[in-house]
């Protein structure tokens, strides 16, 4: 046997081109009908007695057996599966014109959406037995497109389950693999400050670590949420909570044990430790689903923005001058308002409170949403009593667009009952009104009783206006929420009673202006019974575009009871594209007339555009002077990293961060980008370096694994590898896999890889003639699957070949139309090309 190494970059002979063309053609759909062998009479090297019947795409006869097929049911594509096909009966041939029909069991038909209970013959059949579906179900039919390997099933609508648009069958939901995981987010900053107009100077170091660790075991999810902060040498470690949860699929609910928070639809949400059973609307299709808030603000300089909830820092980021938006808060809970702090580069701070509210309470007709809680109250990161309590919430959709809802909270020193009604008035919008009656025992055994009234409204207009009055709420002086009553009872001398809420209003308006952009207006106000001041904030802005130039104008106004004056900021921003680079300009001015201007460039780099960079230079009035910054953010396959430097007249700061995840599973330890809630582990043995589509920087590691983060639970997601990124010794049977993770699942996306040499053989028979065109060659190896078709002049291109083995070659059913090739590849071959060989088939 003679071997030659053929580099892919060199010109190939016509024989090589023919074989490679045959390989490529084999991957394309075939549309030919019956093939006439007479066309091959004058082609040298082709046996006129070769049996081509198996390649005739529309021939009436195909061999029964198991085929891997794509399944389409009533024009809806389902997942691919391996099915057994049997020869059609005469009646089936006459009815459907098919030579092969699928052998489908009762279970498989149910997975396809057939209403089994409507057909007694199906209901009585053994679960895995092949049934005559076309006889049992009137007008049912199948068509096997052999060329495309696609099974097309057709059933009358009356025989199908009535499923909503977007439904993913529960049989496809994947609880995932057992694994340990850690999702981390570390940030740090080192600053030096030396004021020119005073003798003040200092250095400041700050570090923050956010850890979400856990374990998946079957359907159970164990999670812990902890944070660590270090400010100027002072360390703080907070164990925010640990929980154990799982899906209860028959109830479309989620069971949680441990640290969690109550629902915030009817009562104010509070942190708790105990047992929770709540409806999980993610299990419903998109068309049947009924909010973490978006935080907007303006930074005067390169600033650090932190978000606190219940005195815990739950989010921290660094922003550039101008208007910013935070829309990726991790949904830890909906308990408590959010305190946002903007720390400017000169050390000054802005603070405002972002209320955490919901829209009008509505449910679809016949749909019940409920929550059950039992446990003890947790105050968060401050001292308070922790009484035991129970809570029940329920909302039910009635006919004619009505929704009725209510709930109750019971504790030794507190009880509350709530009831309300919501209505979708169509063009007018959605409105809900409710009242809550509460009785509280405060400090010194003092009893207090009162009511709270709430009005919620939301409406989107065809003109592009989205108007939401996310609440007007008024409470009498005797009304206390469960959290207020508990905190006041814990310490009557504290400032808790100062923030006894009286009324709250929040409104959001967004107007789309088509080609002219959009405007938004957000306003909140909250006042208290024991304080004359009011917490107020206003955000307004306009986003527009002229040609390829983007620009925006934003205004913020905030006022707190403890402040002598309000904070007011006005900003203007503009971005101009310069190829792959953007030129940016930002202008901000405050209530004292102090302005800050920034001019710079930003863009992306690298093949996957996963390196973001920006360079800014600025100047501030009123003695602020020059400032500038450089920022880099890299999103790699095993994590993300950021690095920034900024300076002004009074000091300089370096900030940096690392974000990512680690998963330990049965096939190795895999590093990842930040994980999110649900994710997939790609398993592609031997495909090291292969890139994952639509996930910048993610590629398969040396163990054949990669993590695709941030999957949507209970939704089908396509996970794909870039075929052009595979090395020359790896081939894929399919470049994409569909997965449907449950909440918190780590699902396996397994790719069937063929790892080995790519070989081009010139095959001759023992009599010296070339092996006939159209013969099939199959690798005889129990651990590998590889096959191909012989081209003209006996040329065979086949991939995934081991260094040593044998091929079985067939071009007919007779013994004389079969032979075997034993081969041994050279011990050393690089992986940049195709190995050529001359071999005798015996």
Region annotations inferred by a language model:
Residues 2-13, 19-289, 591-663:
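Post-signal-peptide, soluble extracytosolic/periplasmic N-terminal scaffold domains
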Residues 63-88, 686-696, 767-782:
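Short, ordered, surface-exposed loop/turn motifs in non-cytosolic proteins
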Residues 71, 297, 680-684, 757-765:
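A short, amphipathic beta-strand motif
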Residues 82-83, 90, 697-705, 783-795:
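Short, acidic Ser/Thr/Gly-rich low-complexity loop/linker segments typical of extracellular
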Residues 95-104, 329-335, 705-731, 792-815:
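Short Pro-Gly-centered beta-turn/loop motif in secreted/extracellular proteins
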Residues 104, 172-232, 368-439, 603-611, ...:
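Conserved, compact domain cores that house catalytic/ligand-binding motifs in diverse enzymes
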Residues 159, 188-192, 219, 228-232, ...:
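Transmembrane beta-strands of outer-membrane beta-barrel pores
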Residues 173, 205-218, 238-251, 386-400, ...:
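Feature captures outer-membrane beta-barrel proteins of Gram-negative bacteria and organelles
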